[in-house]
Amino acid sequence: MTKRTLSNKSRYSVLKLSGFRSRMATPQGRKTIRNRRKKGRKNLTLRR
């Protein structure tokens, strides 16, 4: 069985990868946010 991607990371380092500001910093991240808004997700990204 393979390890999960962010299994041993601290909350801080996970947010640096997948928090709102880091998503909005790149075109692909903005696309991700747009798709999650379109789908009607309650949580767009991880919360602090």
UniProtKB/Swiss-Prot annotation:
InterPro entries: Ribosomal_bL34, Ribosomal_bL34_CS. PROSITE patterns: RIBOSOMAL_L34. Residues 18-48 are annotated as: Disordered. One of its GO terms (cellular component) is ribonucleoprotein complex. Keywords: Chloroplast, Plastid, Ribonucleoprotein, Ribosomal protein. Its main location: plastid. One of its GO terms (biological process) is translation. Coiled coil: none annotated. It is found in: Plastid, Chloroplast. One of its GO terms (molecular function) is structural constituent of ribosome. Residues 31-48 have a biased composition (Basic residues). Pfam families: Ribosomal_L34. Belongs to the bacterial ribosomal protein bL34 family. This is Large ribosomal subunit protein bL34c. It comes from Phaeodactylum tricornutum (strain CCAP 1055/1).
